[in-house]
Swiss-Prot record:
Entry's localization field: Cytoplasm
Reaction catalyzed: NAD(+) + ATP = ADP + NADP(+) + H(+)
One Gene Ontology MF term: NAD+ kinase activity
Primary role: Involved in the regulation of the intracellular balance of NAD and NADP, and is a key enzyme in the biosynthesis of NADP. Catalyzes specifically the phosphorylation on 2'-hydroxyl of the adenosine moiety of NAD to yield NADP.
Protein name: NAD kinase
Cofactors named for this entry: a divalent metal cation
Top-level class of the enzyme under EC nomenclature: transferase
Binding site residues for NAD(+): 73-74, 78, 151-152, 178, 180, 191-196
GO biological process: NAD metabolic process; NADP biosynthetic process
Source species of the chain: Francisella tularensis subsp. holarctica (strain LVS)
Pfam families per the UniProt record, alphabetical: NAD_kinase (PF01513), NAD_kinase_C (PF20143)
EC number from the UniProt entry: 2.7.1.23
Active-site residue numbers: 73
Length: 296
């Protein structure tokens, strides 16, 4: 069977020796298969590869059939989110980090080659991961990449000081809250910051968004799962200096002022992730997060 994906990009975490070594090994293997390979600019600079085709993430998204991301979940988040802004290019994650929840292919040499060979031939399963976009009412010039989240959009307190917010869903008042913040998470992000704050785990294919309070000063504040078609408006009602901060997947911090409105809704783009044919999301929950693990 011929390869389904012929032009392959490699994107690696920068300044990490074991990632650079994996990129070089991966490049040699793909070259043996007769595939056209493009390496992301900074990734190539970290390796000893010479005379290789290089490109930016935007160019990769527009020119390649598939992108292989080598590193941890953080690197996968950043790269896949940016790639998805420019095209529908599918992404394969190889784990060279700690947890490897999103980068589902193990870096074991023999198993990796077999898995990659099958996926590049088209023998794979696919997950479509939804994203969120946000707008701050007085920050209309924010770059697009600073407004799109694959995991979550979080509004958090500075230096642990409580603040107040008011939430509307689809134009209707939902709730007020005082506490350390609020996380608005995708199903993908439900196993990240949102889970640590007590939120539920959502299947990545679920068409939902979850709102998770962070240390709400209330005995009856609970996470709320809503349709991902809903539009969420969050108003900052009061705070103690310094101001609360809005972050996108843990990056791009924006200072928020009293009475500012943050609008969050589903993004048009999705991240397409390729896995092995036998990939099972619930296996990942058990193996990576110890879900339902028998303790005694």
């Amino acid at each position: 069977m011929a390869f389904k994906y012929h032009k392959v990009a490699i994107v690696g975490k920068h300044y990490k020796k074991e990632v650079s070594q994996m990129v070089e090994t991966l490049y040699a293997y793909l070259q043996q298969q007769g595939l056209e390979i493009i390496v992301e600019n900074d990734t190539a600079a970290d390796t000893s590869l010479v005379n290789v085709a290089i490109a930016s993430l935007k160019e990769i998204a527009l020119r390649c059939d598939v992108a292989i991301v080598v590193g941890g979940d953080g690197n996968f988040l950043k790269a896949s989110r940016l790639l998805a802004l420019y095209s529908n290019i599918p992404v394969i994650g190889i784990n060279k980090g700690k947890l490897g929840f999103l980068t589902t292919l193990a870096a074991d040499d023999n198993a990796l080659k077999n898995d990659l060979y099958a996926i590049l031939k088209g023998d794979s399963s696919v997950t479509k991961m939804s994203m969120l976009k946000c707008r701050v009412d007085n920050n209309l010039r924010a770059p697009l990449e600073a407004s799109i989240a694959l995991n979550e959009i979080a509004i958090t307190a500075s230096r642990g000081l409580m603040f107040g917010l008011k939430v509307f869903i689809d134009g209707r008042y939902a709730f007020d809250q005082r506490g350390d913040g609020l996380i608005v998470s995708t199903p993908t992000g439900s196993t990240a910051h949102a889970m640590s704050a007590g939120g539920p785990i959502l299947n990545p294919n679920q068409n939902s968004v979850v709102l998770v309070p962070i240390c709400s000063h209330s005995l009856n504040s609970r996470p709320l799962v809503i349709s991902d078609e809903s539009v969420i408006d969050i108003y900052i009602t009061d705070y103690n200096d310094p101001e609360p901060v809005l972050s996108i997947d843990g990056r791009h911090d924006t200072i928020l002022k009293a009475h500012q409105k943050v609008t969050i809704q589903k993004a048009r783009k999705k991240v397409t992730v390729l896995h092995t044919k036998d990939y099972n999301y619930y296996d990942t929950l058990r193996e990576k997060l110890g879900w339902s693990k028998v303790l005694f």
